[in-house]
Amino acid sequence: EKPSYGFNLLFQSGLLKIIFPELQKLHGVQIREGKSHKDNFFHTLQVLDNISKATDDLWLRWAAILHDIAKPDTKRFNKKVGWTFHGHEDKGAQWVPSIFKRMKLPLNEHMKLVQKLVRLHLRPIALISKNVTDAAIRRLMYEAGDEIDDLLMLCKADITSKNNNRVQQYLMNFKHVEDKIQKVESKDSLRNFKNPITGEKIMEIFDLEPSRIVGELKEMVKEAIIENKIPNQYDAALEYIKKEGKSQGIVFKQK
């Protein structure tokens, strides 16, 4: 129930920096011009304990351990706002395969799940604004797919503060996000969203070789569905890419 205990022992014994140097690097607080950041090592252990109260899923625990792993490498100081860690979620996701390989963990769908959760862990809380569009919710649901519940669980576990009033405010904001996601999901059934037209089908119909154009057309369809410009149907998607391709000067040799 408190896996942080073992990591604390490794930290105190000096073994952590040998076994898991990336996690060790999260330790410490830097102060500049009166502005500091939290100790991301102890924050990570708190997130790990939080998620362990909600689930015994090993891979969600690994997502908790790795969610901020790239913060030391992305740390910058801005005189106006203080310390920033822009892009730590993307860099952290890039690190997941190499960390898994070194730890002799499986490089399969479990690794891909952890990678996805690390990459997306900031996204739900960014949807707090009252003016957030349904399209923004759809985009998150599309990217998270079946793992949307796991992602929300990780984000909730990521709420740590010694100030209980602040925690309650964050939890209230997070509940607002969950309600928005539920509302859009019940209306659009996007949890298992699949693009109605595959890259292979685009190449078959237009006699194209694998290329950047194929990926761009497929992305156009996804964005059009998310923005509610077209229904999630094959015929609508096909007509849309024909029209968009023509407007952008892409010439197809149709079979």
Description of each model-found segment:
Residues 1-62, 69-87, 91-109, 198, ...:
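Glycine- and charge-enriched loop/helix tracts that form the active or gating conduit
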Residues 29-38, 48-49, 105-168:
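Histidine/acidic-rich helix-loop-helix segments that form or flank divalent-metal centers
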Residues 19-25, 81, 136, 186-189, ...:
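Glycine-rich, flexible loop/turn motifs
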Residues 64-67, 90, 94, 98, ...:
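Feature representing long, continuous alpha-helical segments
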Residues 9-10, 47, 92, 118, ...:
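A residue-level signal for conserved active-site and pocket-lining positions in enzyme catalytic cores
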Residues 98-99, 161-255:
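Charged substrate- and nucleic-acid-binding regions of tRNA-handling and nucleotidyl-transfer enzymes
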Residues 52, 56, 65, 70, ...:
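Hydrophobic alpha-helix feature that most strongly marks membrane-spanning transmembrane helices
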Residues 16-21, 33, 67-69, 122, ...:
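Short hydrophobic/aromatic-rich motifs at helix boundaries and adjacent loops
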